[in-house]
């Protein structure tokens, strides 16, 4: 089970939202690259980076911030947020991003998926499905899609998509556990590779996720729980990794 720390960028800074609500925003560090270095020092093998400004506007507002992270790190980035054109996909992959996540555009412009897959391998393109009660939400979770989450997944699979980042919106940022049943159901019904997202809070949640590997859930994106130092091993890293030279006394991190 691959654990992928999340970095959300808004106005150039590293933030976390609660259930995607921009009015419930918490700033953790001014420089997202510093946050990326911290997660790499804590043995991250991949990072999930989202340009929240781009998700709102469609403009790649934080492109240079993301490019800096790519340059500084030796692990792949998975990048999402407002990717609505072939040009946006190309710009990210050209700077060395490992794979891009296409969300709302997969619903509003499915032809983009076909266009992108004519040029890039499926391993480079991921579709993000954010669902509430089994119904995909798009455009910053403000609109509902006219199909079930698994129906959208199967449509993307037919086009050639192999992996989905599946987020249970009701759990995202709530620190109350992840959507076990919804994630299991989606993975079972689509037979796709699934990266779970939203609500993982504890080691117990991770152990439950391991039980879903048989259905194709092989990785998980974790945000707020890592930032709030919910995992005991993080204290060890903070206390003994003296070469982490960044001021990471953000939030409730318990660095002595």
Swiss-Prot record:
GO terms for cellular component: cytoplasm. It is found in: Cytoplasm. The active site is at residues 8, 130. GO terms for molecular function: 1-(5-phosphoribosyl)-5-[(5-phosphoribosylamino)methylideneamino]imidazole-4-carboxamide isomerase activity. InterPro entries: Aldolase_TIM (IPR013785), His_biosynth (IPR006062), HisA_bact_arch (IPR006063), Isoase_HisA-like (IPR044524), Isoase_HisA-like_bact (IPR023016), RibuloseP-bd_barrel (IPR011060). It catalyses: 1-(5-phospho-beta-D-ribosyl)-5-[(5-phospho-beta-D-ribosylamino)methylideneamino]imidazole-4-carboxamide = 5-[(5-phospho-1-deoxy-D-ribulos-1-ylimino)methylamino]-1-(5-phospho-beta-D-ribosyl)imidazole-4-carboxamide. Keywords: Amino-acid biosynthesis, Cytoplasm, Histidine biosynthesis, Isomerase. Its main location: cytoplasm. One of its GO terms (biological process) is L-tryptophan biosynthetic process. Pathway: Amino-acid biosynthesis; L-histidine biosynthesis; L-histidine from 5-phospho-alpha-D-ribose 1-diphosphate: step 4/9. Its EC number is 5.3.1.16. Belongs to the HisA/HisF family. HAMAP family: HisA. NCBIfam families: 1-(5-phosphoribosyl)-5-[(5-phosphoribosylamino)methylideneamino]imidazole-4-carboxamide isomerase (TIGR00007). This is 1-(5-phosphoribosyl)-5-[(5-phosphoribosylamino)methylideneamino] imidazole-4-carboxamide isomerase. The lineage of its organism: Bacteria, Pseudomonadati, Chlorobiota, Chlorobiia, Chlorobiales.
